[in-house]
Amino acid sequence: MKSDSPVHGESHTECQSPCPLSCMPARLEGSTKRRLAANARERRRMQGLNTAFDSLRKVVPQWGEDKKLSKYETLQMALSYIMALSRILTEAERYSRTDPGEWTKMHFDHIQEEQCLSYMGVRCPRDCDRYLPQTFSH
């Protein structure tokens, strides 16, 4: 019958459960290494996620440049932006069958000066005209 305690000369890593106190340093060392590896993987995962959010923030319209959007706000803005673009494409497809110029006229007629100014962050109406092509070129 084999004893549960390690035989003299066996290494601490070969200990079986239940383990005497002499095996504890080897077990702690192993669990510490695993924890450090898991922490490093999680840190890399979070860095990748943060990089992805930074990339998304660059392409999502932002009302003000004074503060960075939170992750939640970034996702909300991305969803709204995607839905708006989908709506525009659907309408464009519907109007392209009849008169493509009518679709453009309809959208530009509905743009209010205040909306343009607040979106572009400008105060003067003549500045708005300068930014309109940039706004709709994406």
Swiss-Prot record:
GO biological process, one term: sensory organ development
PROSITE patterns linked: BHLH (PS50888)
Gene Ontology CC terms, in alphabetical order: axon; nucleus; perikaryon
Induction behaviour: Inhibited by Notch and ESR1.
Entry keyword Transcription: yes
A Pfam family per the record: HLH
Top-rank taxon: Eukaryota
Subcellular location: Nucleus; Perikaryon; Cell projection, Axon
Keyword entries, A-Z: Cell projection, Developmental protein, Differentiation, DNA-binding, Neurogenesis, Nucleus, Transcription, Transcription regulation
Main location, first listed in the record: nucleus
UniProt GO molecular function: DNA-binding transcription factor activity, RNA polymerase II-specific; E-box binding; protein dimerization activity; transcription cis-regulatory region binding
Function: Transcription factor that binds to DNA at the consensus sequence 5'-CAG[GC]TG-3'. Positively regulates the determination of retinal ganglion cell fate and formation of the optic nerve and retino-hypothalamic tract. Required for retinal circadian rhythm photoentrainment. Plays a role in brainstem auditory signaling and binaural processing. Regulates the differentiation of olfactory receptor neurons. During retinal neurogenesis, activates the transcription of several genes such as brn3d, coe3, cbfa2t2, glis2, elrC and xgadd45-gamma.
Descriptive protein name: Transcription factor Atoh7-b
Gene: atoh7-b
